[in-house]
Amino acid sequence: MAALSGGGGSSSGGGGGGGGGGGGGDGGGGAEQGQALFNGDMEPEAGAGAAASSAADPAIPEEVWNIKQMIKLTQEHIEALLDKFGGEHNPPSIYLEAYEEYTSKLDALQQREQQLLESLVFQTPTDASRNNPKSPQKPIVRVFLPNKQRTVVPARCGVTVRDSLKKALMMRGLIPECCAVYRIQDGEKKPIGWDTDISWLTGEELHVEVLENVPLTTHNFVRKTFFTLAFCDFCRKLLFQGFRCQTCGYKFHQRCSTEVPLMCVNYDQLDLLFVSKFFEHHPVPQEEASFPETALPSGSSSAPPSDSTGPQILTSPSPSKSIPIPQPFRPADEDHRNQFGQRDRSSSAPNVHINTIEPVNIDDLIRDQGFRGDGGSTTGLSATPPASLPGSLTNVKALQKSPGPQRERKSSSSSSSEDRSRMKTLGRRDSSDDWEIPDGQITVGQRIGSGSFGTVYKGKWHGDVAVKMLNVTAPTPQQLQAFKNEVGVLRKTRHVNILLFMGYSTKPQLAIVTQWCEGSSLYHHLHIIETKFEMIKLIDIARQTAQGMDYLHAKSIIHRDLKSNNIFLHEDLTVKIGDFGLATVKSRWSGSHQFEQLSGSILWMAPEVIRMQDKNPYSFQSDVYAFGIVLYELMTGQLPYSNINNRDQIIFMVGRGYLSPDLSKVRSNCPKAMKRLMAECLKKKRDERPLFPQILASIELLARSLPKIHRSASEPSLNRAGFQTEDFSLYACASPKTPIQAGGYGGFPVH
């Protein structure tokens, strides 16, 4: 640091000695004054000091640039050290000394850089500048944008180029990630980083250009009347008559046309480009792919011990990073409207979690979310029962219990007393205790599979059933009560696309009994026997899955482990969402307190669930992300991230938001609307994902819009109309082209 400062000071001092004769005429004195000014050790004195300061000022921007390069070089040294020794829990002491030396040097360089920036921005004019006044340089930067557009942004200290140009780019339908920024220096364009401080570029001109590989086109708008459920992509309000881009699917009202992005960006290919560029320039070593300790909850096997030296270095508060990433990680704004309990995750024991605390109004969620789809059908056309329609859950219960207005007209005291007595009787019959199956009534058969929290058997109880024995040998009273509370909600689930809950048992151990499904799982069909489904069948499977999840969410039930292993197909391809687990028995308990830890099927986990930074990461939108992965399996026939064999690397990249499924692998005959829906469900930010009522409406609209092959009207089939073979003898109606025997008609002689 001393050598660096001394060198810089000599350069400035030399300039002072050569340029200011009134300062004493001694080049050495000018050098001393320049060095003092550069190091910030003393204030310049009158006379020679003023001349040296005046001569050194023009060199400050150049010194700032040099310091910036030194900072970059120091950071590279730190990253190289971390690449070499960062994965070791007890690195050598010489490595720690070198690490501390580089970080101290980096802090000093950054502090000196800040001092120079302040002197550059808040510089006061000297006597020479008063004698020769110049127009003050405005702290602005001129920027040339794509499509021959330009703008001017203020050069504020501490603000990056990205933040300064973000608004201007968004108004033109662009994002910084799809553009590159250049500065003009010596007549040449030199690229600069988006995280560069804008104050370093005061008075310069920047050029923003779209990257070559970014699919950027102009919109192709058409007027459209949306007869099904659709929302404006700008104001998020209901859309009936408006416009839609045929390329990117952007929908809007006529009054919102001024807010439409000017450019049409294919974000699917853009995400793929970012991921490929990231892996190309920033490979993640295997020893560094484990998730940082601060992002993993306590108790996770992936987190190193807190008293080791390695994690302290990896999570050091210094500006350097252990792994080079494009920008610092910022967790998405989490939605705290739904307060649900939590539990451990398992790759083979899925879970449906029940919110027994407070019902959730899906209308409010839909209103806040909006949806970027092609629109969809009204939920009235859905085969979903009324309980799955969007709306307040209290209203749904009222609809289920009141068949019509006639019951409301019963106001006599006798009828109301009878109703109350009937309700009490039904309440006693429908209690949770009546759903408990006594010990000895279930005949347990062959073992089907096992997971971290239970084992599934095929059993007999008034027919074939699936019995899931839970790994809880001696439940505490708190666990047993929570288990019964959740069973009280599960017993009310009745839907064609949900495995039927039939009961539970507590002796000899906790177990739940569900309907037995004769078919195989969707995972078995797609990845084991590789069944080749037609596209219309795949879309129907997606529709039924969305319909079942829509019903669960309307019941305030979060699945929390939706994946292709838990979706079963009957022989007639009827979808059954199953493997109901319970959050109570899948959590780590200490007395009456419940704790969480990261485990489960990582391929289907949303980024916010992987991070586990919030007390409550599970929500309706986390199920939507898992459904997006299921859609990816349906449309590609393979699992995501099949090219990455390191589980920790997948956890790190998905949790940080740098890895998403490659949508370019979908089948060629996959509809564009389905691909857009898949991209919406796989949004990295939770609040940007749609909800299942909108997803179901879009899939139903897509299914109705697919071309269907009908029987030709020119080739009728009498069998299809209900005729039997005996009926043909009753009607001697010959075809017009059939030769007619002359014996039937006397007008033709017979020769």
Curated annotation (Swiss-Prot):
Keywords: Acetylation, Allosteric enzyme, ATP-binding, Cell membrane, Chromosomal rearrangement, Cytoplasm, Isopeptide bond, Kinase, Membrane, Metal-binding, Methylation, Nucleotide-binding, Nucleus, Phosphoprotein, Proto-oncogene, Serine/threonine-protein kinase, Transferase, Ubl conjugation, Zinc
Binding site for ATP: I448, G449, S450, G451, S452, F453, G454, T455, V456, K468
Activity regulation: In quiescent cells, maintained in an inactive state via an intramolecular interaction between the protein kinase and N-terminal domains. Following mitogen-mediated cell activation, binds via its RGB domain to active HRAS (GTP-bound) which releases the inhibitory intramolecular interaction between the two domains. This allows the MAP2K1-mediated dimerization of KSR1 or KSR2, and BRAF which activates BRAF.
Subcellular localization(s) per the UniProt record: Nucleus; Cytoplasm; Cell membrane
Cited SUPFAM superfamilies: Cysteine-rich domain (SSF57889), Protein kinase-like (PK-like) (SSF56112), Ubiquitin-like (SSF54236)
Listed InterPro entries: C1-like_sf, DAG/PE-bd, Kinase-like_dom_sf, PE/DAG-bd, Prot_kinase_dom, Protein_kinase_ATP_BS, RBD_dom, Ser-Thr/Tyr_kinase_cat_dom
Posttranslational mods: Phosphorylation at Ser-348 by SGK1 inhibits its activity. Dephosphorylation of Ser-348 by the SHOC2-MRAS-PP1c (SMP) complex consisting of SHOC2, GTP-bound M-Ras/MRAS and the catalytic subunit of protein phosphatase 1 (PPP1CA, PPP1CB or PPP1CC); this relieves inactivation and stimulates kinase activity. Methylation by PRMT5 decreases stability and kinase activity.
Cross-link (Glycyl lysine isopeptide (Lys-Gly) (interchain with G-Cter in ubiquitin)): K563
Catalytic activity: L-seryl-[protein] + ATP = O-phospho-L-seryl-[protein] + ADP + H(+); L-threonyl-[protein] + ATP = O-phospho-L-threonyl-[protein] + ADP + H(+)
GO CC terms in record: cell body; centriolar satellite; ciliary basal body; cytoplasm; cytosol; glutamatergic synapse; mitochondrion; neuron projection
Modified positions (N-acetylalanine) in chain numbering: A2
Cofactor binding summary note: Binds 2 Zn(2+) ions per subunit.
Chain segments annotated as coiled-coil in the UniProt record: none
Biased amino acid composition, Gly residues: 1-32
Biased composition regions of type Low complexity, renumbered to the chain: 46-55, 297-324
Cofactor(s) demanded: Zn(2+)
Modified residues annotated as Phosphothreonine in this record: T356, T379, T384, T738
Identification of the protein by name: Serine/threonine-protein kinase B-raf
Organism of this sequence: Mus musculus
